[in-house]
A protein has these predicted regions:
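Single conserved hydrophobic/aromatic residue that forms the stacking wall/gate
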Residues: 1-9
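Charged, amphipathic alpha-helical linkers/stalks
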Residues: 12-100
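Hydrophobic, aromatic-lined core segments that form the binding pocket/scaffold
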Residues: 62-290
Length: 290
């Protein structure tokens, strides 16, 4: 299934990840997107930023989490340092700048359990209304049961053995997740291409603000998918992850997070201290491992 988004002079068609057949298209080779020529200066800038972000998520030399964190950091810097030019954008996305950024990230340590607890809470919060309405029950029930189990364990125990057990289980899970790396990269590249640009945003500052908000939402989507998959894996006695399981989680979480722009903005304003996060919060939910 595809959806059309109008611009003043063009239409763009994108595939929707809430359809299983679309995910099937993404499991073999990198997805490609049309090159769009735009003469209006503010949208030309937006297209350049978006193209670089898509290129970043497609770079297999970076983990998915690292690419998302790099992308958000650059967007936040561009937002703070107005006005910007195409030369500024190219400099931020240059190999030299990215190497410095990723080297700096190596000195950051966020405990795995802190990331796990926050991701658990994010997934539970996203699921509240669907549970009330009795939607996606067969999918959510085992996942959220497992989430509650871990929440209770962490609230009642300071035992380091729990942390070690979680780390071992997560290491095994992450190893299996890498088998489907191309699916996640294609999913995220499509989200970036289809969602980052708003034709309604009049100024460059507003365009970049919109990009930051949508990037945060994409990070929430990815976090929810990854967390739900880990909880499924834990609930099913560490059973191997299959492609069908990966696809189901991407499809259902995509349906659950398919909010329009106003609803996304409202959700972020109601759920977080600030509409635009500090970069450190993104690092918390993505996880930074040495």
């Amino acid at each position: 299934r595809s959806t059309l988004f109008p611009y003043t002079t063009l239409f763009r068609s994108t595939l929707m990840p809430c359809c299983p057949a679309v995910i099937d298209l993404w499991c073999e080779k990198p997805v490609t997107f049309p090159v769009i020529s735009e003469t209006r200066n503010n949208l030309s800038t937006a297209f350049l930023i978006r193209d670089n972000l898509v290129k970043l998520i497609s770079d297999q030399g970076l983990s998915v989490e690292q690419a998302l964190l790099d992308g958000l950091y650059i967007l936040l810097e561009l937002y703070k340092n107005q006005p910007i030019t195409n030369a500024h954008i190219q400099e931020y996305f240059s190999g030299h700048t990215l190497n410095k950024l990723n080297t700096a990230m190596e000195d950051i340590h966020i405990p795995d359990e802190d990331t796990f607890i926050e991701c658990n809470e994010l997934l539970q919060d996203l699921s509240v209304n669907y549970r009330k309405e009795g939607l996606y029950t067969a999918f959510l029930q085992p996942v959220l049961t497992e989430a509650c189990k871990y929440s209770n364990i962490y609230s009642q125990s300071d035992d380091n053995s729990m942390s070690r057990t979680l780390q071992t289980s997560q290491k095994q899970f992450c190893s299996m997740l890498t088998d489907y790396d191309i699916v996640f990269r294609n999913y995220l590249a499509n989200e970036l291409f289809s969602d980052l640009i708003s034709p309604e945003a009049a100024s460059t500052k507003k365009i970049i603000e919109h990009m930051i908000i949508k990037m945060q939402w994409i990070m929430i989507e990815y976090t929810a998918i990854r967390q739900s998959l880990f909880l499924w894996y834990s609930h099913n006695a560490n059973s191997p992850l299959t492609y069908e399981t990966i696809r189901e989680h991407i499809v259902i979480i995509s349906r659950m997070t398919g909010y329009d722009d106003d609803d996304i903005r409202e959700y972020l304003e109601n759920s977080f201290a600030k509409l635009i996060w500090d970069w450190g919060y993104a690092a918390l939910i993505m996880g930074i491992r040495k």
